[in-house]
Each structure stands twice: as structure tokens, then as C-alpha cells.
Amino acid sequence: MNKILEVENLVFKYEKESDVNQLNGVSFSITKGEWVSIIGQNGSGKSTTARLIDGLFEEFEGIVKIDGERLTAENVWNLRRKIGMVFQNPDNQFVGATVEDDVAFGMENQGIPREEMIKRVDEALLAVNMLDFKTREPARLSGGQKQRVAVAGIIALRPEIIILDESTSMLDPTGRSEIMRVIHEIKDKYHLTVLSITHDLDEAASSDRILVMRAGEIIKEAAPSELFATSEDMVEIGLDVPFSSNLMKDLRTNGFDLPEKYLSEDELVELLADKLG
């Protein structure tokens, strides 16, 4: 299978003189078209890993390969074109006076012809349902709308990989759901690979695969159905349990005949509707 991202034995510390490593031998790979989430407690190394992949830190031990090519100081700018990163706070990403200016900014830096930029701006804003807002000032948008524009700015650049670095953590539940729906849609439309750094276990549950980090190391790798199947495993890792897992446990205690495997909220609602219908 085509591995679009390979990470081998990453070791990193923020200060050279420090005895503490933020990452200790992190290794994993992602196949083209996969959605992989990294979860873990604060300080576990999730965001540090994502930023190393995006070439934001120069000095580290180990290997990062993007689409088969090893990341180096010499090729970082070329390889970074294959990656789009959406950060936690959309306000920190805005540079344009209007929504369309902001989406066009990255393309201007890449020297994309004006006619092509105009076409891509409209296509990207349409994909995130923000085309009607293209002449608005970003400051007048809601949090969810701002994050949609940030996503539009990324997909206009035509990356192969999107990295979501806690990109929904500042949104309310409705805004969070809308952004995740939009990203799933554009992933399928543009055949993208997604690496999601998240605290939201319900968000991670929609991934193909989950990596669990603790103290700079990957301590577990599994499909959501396996990882979330037992609440005891999640507690041992030091993480919360998804709402649907807790609800299923309570329902079983009260006599409901439910499968032992993990079900997402939507899957559980569908199952209960069938049983009670």
C-alpha cells in the first residue's frame, strides 16, 4: 500500500541542554487516503509530532518521509506544499482583509496565476459552504465560520495531507460537528489524507486508526472499535471514555442486549431505534 507519511524513531527536545525529551522514538506510517487521529493527555507530544512533520522544527533525530521523500532543511519548503495544517485558533491564521483575500494569500506566496487563484478561491469556499461570505471581514465571522475559511485556505493550495492540530477545540459542539462534516466531505472529494491531533474522543472515533501518545511515546495503536471497546483500557491510558461507550455500559447494566464492540453515537442511535421501533 502507498505510504504517504512515514515517521521513524523521532526524538526531539525544545532545549538542547535539557535532559527531557518531548519525543522519545516515535514511529508510525499513514497510508494514502487514511484518516488517523493522535490522542493523549496534554504534554504527551501530539502537537510536537505534527509540527515536526510539517517542518516547523529543524533540529531533531529520526526520519520523516513525505510521499517517499525524506524531509530535510533543503527540501522543507517543497515538501511543505504537500501538507496543509489547520491550527487551534483560526484568528492566528488570518492575514487578509476579506475572506477571499485570506484564502488567496497562500496561493500568492506560491506564485499561482491570478485566474487560477480566483477559480480555486471560489471552489474552496464553495466546498466549505462559505462562498456567500467571500467579501466579508474575517473578524465578523463566528468561530465555526472562521475555521471553515481556514480549511478553505488549505484546500485551495491542493495539499495531499491535511493536519488538524486541535482545530475544533475552541468551537461549541455544533460548530465542531459542522467542521468535521466539512472535512470528511472534502477528504472524500479531493482524496486527501488526514492526520488529526485531538482531545475529542467522539471526533477520533470517526478515524480509520488511532495512535495513543503518553510522555512522548506511542503506547497503543488500534482501530476505534478496538480501542474504545472497554472503558477500563481507556482509564488505564489516562483518557476519558466516549459518551456512547459509557451509555452502552449503563444500558447493558439495565438489561439491554447490546454488542460488546464499540459503537459511535450514530450507530448506537440506529441500533436502539431498531430495537425499540
UniProtKB/Swiss-Prot annotation:
GO terms for molecular function: ATP binding; ATP hydrolysis activity; ATPase-coupled transmembrane transporter activity. Its main location: membrane. Its EC number is 7.-.-.-. CDD domains: ABC_cobalt_CbiO_domain1. It comes from Lactococcus lactis subsp. cremoris (strain MG1363). ATP-binding (A) component of a common energy-coupling factor (ECF) ABC-transporter complex. Unlike classic ABC transporters this ECF transporter provides the energy necessary to transport a number of different substrates. In this organism these probably include biotin, thiamine precursor, niacin, pantothenic acid, queuosine precursor, riboflavin and thiamine. Uptake of niacin or riboflavin into proteosomes containing EcfA1A2T and Niax or RibU has been demonstrated. Uptake requires hydrolyzable Mg-ATP and is substrate-specific; NiaX-containing proteosomes did not transport riboflavin. The gene is ecfA1. This is Energy-coupling factor transporter ATP-binding protein EcfA1. One of its GO terms (cellular component) is ATP-binding cassette (ABC) transporter complex. The active site is at 166 (proton acceptor).
